[in-house]
């Protein structure tokens, strides 16, 4: 099959939810979980120049009362944020920011993170009729259902009948 034949048969699928799906109070239980391993933590910590020994030196972490190495909190945040993308913002629209980020409990190498988000507000964009502005409250949990991180994030979210280009 030639490339042009292949392209002519391709079907474009819409990804993610749209603004009309974002009703205040709606809760998304994000279906993926992610176990954080030592390599994830070490790579993230060194690649972001975050050289706090709590994140890569077990004897140091233990000297401060921790059982083992802590996971870098920014990796926790980014992982939980990432778990929410498929449901909340994969459909397209610029990221507008994060507010009220709280790291609630420590996360350790080997912990599995899950996420849940609730629509806090949704309103039409005054400047771009193809989008709405949505804010969610996202919570991250460990494998024991203990909340470890919480934040609000805001995105422009494409309307169902909007043009495909941003």
Identify the function of each model-found stretch.
Residues 1-23, 107-112, 116-166:
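HotDog/MaoC-like acyl-thioester-processing domains
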Residues 95-107:
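Generic detector of contiguous secondary-structure segments
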Residues 34-36, 102, 119-123:
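Short, charged beta-turn/beta-strand-edge "cap" motif at the junction between a beta-strand
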Residues 2-98, 149, 160-166:
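Hot-dog-fold acyl-thioester-processing enzymes
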């Amino acid at each position: 099959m030639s490339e042009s034949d292949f392209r002519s048969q391709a079907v474009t699928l819409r990804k993610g939810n749209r603004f009309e799906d974002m009703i205040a109070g709606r809760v998304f239980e994000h279906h993926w979980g992610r176990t954080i391993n030592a390599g994830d933590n070490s790579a993230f910590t060194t690649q972001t120049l975050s050289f706090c020994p709590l994140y890569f030196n077990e004897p140091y972490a233990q000297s401060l009362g921790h059982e083992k190495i802590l996971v870098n909190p920014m990796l926790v945040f980014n992982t939980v944020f990432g778990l929410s993308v498929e449901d909340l913002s994969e459909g397209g629209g610029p990221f507008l920011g994060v507010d009220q980020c709280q790291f609630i409990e420590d996360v350790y190498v080997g912990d599995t993170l899950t996420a849940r988000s609730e629509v806090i507000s949704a309103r039409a964009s005054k400047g771009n009729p193809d989008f709405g502005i949505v804010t969610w409250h996202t919570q991250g949990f460990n494998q024991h259902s203990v909340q470890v991180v919480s934040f609000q994030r805001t995105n422009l979210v494409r309307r169902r009948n909007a043009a495909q280009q941003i």
